[in-house]
Structure formats: C-alpha cells, structure tokens
Amino acid sequence: MKKLIMGAALTLLAGGAQAADDVTLQLKWVTQAQFAGYYVAAAKGCYEEEGLNVTILPGGPDIAPSQVIAGGGADVVVDWMPSALAAREKGLPLVNIAQPFASSGMMLTCLAETGIKAPADFADKTLGVWFYGNEYPFLSWMSQLGLATDGSAGGVTVLKQGFNVDPLLQKQAACISTMTYNEYWQVIDAGITPEQLVTFKYQDMGVATLEDGLYVLEDKLADPAFAERMVKFVRASMKGWKYAEANPDEAAMIVLDNDTTGAQTEVHQKRMMGEVAKLTAGSNGALDVAAAEKTVATLMAGGSDPVITAAPTGAWTSAITDLALQ
C-alpha cells in the first residue's frame, strides 16, 4: 500500500534532537488533485523544513470536516466558506486562516436538449444538487432568481444528488451540480460531448462563494504555540500549491502516490490538476476580504430561508497569513 509519511519525525540540530511539531489536516474530500498543494508540500519537504510533522486525512461522503475538528480529530480543516459560516452560526467557532483557492469551481451542467439556455430556463426543471453543506450556494442562487425550490409550479424541483453524475446520464435531471475539475469531466468521459451540454459557472453568474479555505477553531488561535504552527503550516502549504501550479503533471503523480484506494487514474488527476491550478492562480494564501464579504452577502440573500441570518464577526483573520507571507 502506497503511503507517504508526512513531514519528519525528528529534526537533528547541533544541540541535539528536537521533535517536530505535529499538525493534522482534514481534507474536505477524498485524495485527489483538489488537494495537491498539501501532498506536494509534504513530498517536497516543505513541511519538514518548517519543523512540522503533518498528517493528511482524506475525507469522503460520510466525513464532515467541521465535525472532525469539533471532535478534536484535526487541527486544521479544508472546507468551503458557506458550510464553515453555517457551522459558526450554529455554535462551532470556525475561523478562516488562509484561502488557497481564489476562484470557485462549482457549476451546473445541463443537457442542451432540455432547452435550457439561460438561468431563467431552470423554471419547472429538475436540478441535481449536492447536500451536506454543498447546497448553500445553490439555494442562495435560486432565491436570487426568484425560483422556489419546493417543486411548485414555476420553480425548480431539487433532486438530492449523490456524488456522481448518474442523474444527468440517466436523464433524471436537466442539470446537475459539477465541479470544473471533476464531475464535468466524468460527464465527458461517459460519452457526452461539450456541444451537448450547457454550463453555468457560479463564478460567471456572480453567485460564487469561497471554496477550499483553511479553518481552525477560534480558541486555539489564542495559544501562541498553535498560532506559530499554523504560520509554518500555511507558509509551507502555499509553497506546495505554487509548485503544483507550475508543475501540474508532477503534482498529479504525487497525488496518485498518496491514493491508497487505487480509485484515481493518471489521466483524470492530471486533467484535474490543470483545472485546479486555474482556481488557485492569483492566490498567495491571503483571504480576499471583499470575496469573503461577497460570500456572506450571497448566503444572506436567501429570502425567507437564508443560509446564515446575520453577518458573522471574527469568522476570518489575516493574523496567520500576515506572518506566513512576510
């Protein structure tokens, strides 16, 4: 079984042996190029150089990063801001300390044969939507379009989509949720051509929310030793991300080396890394506060059922990146 030992257990110094600082990272999803920067940082010794021993935990359909960190199973998690803010409003004090992804990769992918050409055409159609926190951007978008999501006339029928593209292939839905770097290509690989599809990127529609940020528990940041570990972790992780952007094929192979399931393929991971690089491009890891505020505004635009009911305070900090990016 392929497994990469993250970081170094011991760093030998002139004065003796000093144990590396442990950091556990919980990913939002399974091992794939969506998280290449962290695997690359480990493989290239970036964490080791910072004196860190980083354990990377893959996610999955039954793993919620917020629940893992709440239970003490991770020091830092990768999550989308909508789900992090929703969790914060419900009492889990998650704080964004860095934002490697500058752009959103989320979109609706529709069959052209359904007649959908613009968002207004969603009316009276069935749309596949991911849940478990991934539904928040979609629900806000539909609210802004004035489309009810209860299946009533003139609204849309929401199909609770599994983490696959079957509803589109089987024509159970006119559109499904996809990521630019993953499920869209699963549709293409299934034999449907780009010309047979119509896509609506959340980024282009003006309803994008921030994805794949790094989150910790607020009270932990009060500990100077923990904060220092996070500064080192973010600095090393961003080195990994920039290397992955510049060397996408190599990064994809590093990801494959860490896929203990054997489910990923070289073709898919190289393609995914090429698309993910477009989303991390332009980010040095520091959160764009304007983008965060836009995310908040989008989530609060949910009419009678907003994702969050009040603008959060203390939901992000630049304290870590200010030091990490000096």
Named regions from a protein language model:
Residues 7-13:
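Bacterial N-terminal signal peptides
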Residues 1-4:
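Positively charged n-region of N-terminal signal peptides that target proteins for export
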Residues 149-156, 194-198, 227, 260-273, ...:
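Short, surface-exposed acidic
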Residues 222-305:
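Secondary-structure end/capping motifs
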Residues 22-161, 167-170, 174-181, 202, ...:
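Short, glycine-/small- and polar/acidic-enriched structural segments
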Residues 15-20:
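Sec/Tat signal peptide C-region and signal peptidase I cleavage site
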Residues 293-326:
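Conserved C-terminal helix/tail region of periplasmic/extracytoplasmic solute-binding proteins
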Residues 82-83, 163-260:
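Pocket-lining segment of extracytoplasmic ligand-binding domains
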